[in-house]
Amino acid sequence: MDSPFTDVAVLLTGVGKRYDIVSAFAQHATVIAADPNPLAPAQYAAQHRRAVPRIDDPDYVPALRALCDEFGVGAVVPLTDLDLEVLAVARAAGQLPAFVPDPEIARATFDKYGTHLLLQRHGLPSPPTVLPGEPVEHFPVMVKPRWGSGARSIHRADDIHAAEFFVHYIAEAAMVQWFMDGPEFSMDVLSDLDGRCLNVIPRTMLESRGGE
């Protein structure tokens, strides 16, 4: 039976190797897969594929806008967090129908320390987190890059000497966060463009490959 949504065009960005996700979208919509890598494997699960400029290229958003016009795209959905802020700014400016949060939220979620402060402002629990040079009151801790994703360059430190070593070892802006032991849970939240929560899917994180 044909899906009633096959006439809906969805532009997926940063498809990379996320073949299963692209394939799932393609079963219910006309999918345009966009990635800077013209050989990205997941693009072959879509009905249409396009190589686009890199996220940091000023022509990135205009290229996506052109694809929206060409295919009548009703939704731009990023499959990576790397372009969240870029798409959020474009959405706020009325350039793209992107399914992303407001720019302030997108900016904070890519900045782990910014996320910590955002959670605190809203009265939500967050592990004690400090920047290098600030006092650490509890060990062990995790030393990790302040910006970025993919569970990269994360190191456990059991004392202040190890923490100071790893702060310099990762060679980029770092933060120090209380080590949280026990099972890790990830919550996938589906919301509409007005920020209303439609569904939440909790998952136990058994393994992380590139943050997924």
Show which residues each predicted segment covers:
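Short, charged, surface-exposed secondary-structure boundary motifs
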Residues: 41-45, 59-62, 106-114, 153, ...
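ATP-grasp fold ATP-binding core
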Residues: 119, 127-129, 137-154, 172-182, ...
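Short, surface-exposed amphipathic charged segments that create phosphate/polyanion-binding patches used
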Residues: 66, 112-118, 191-194
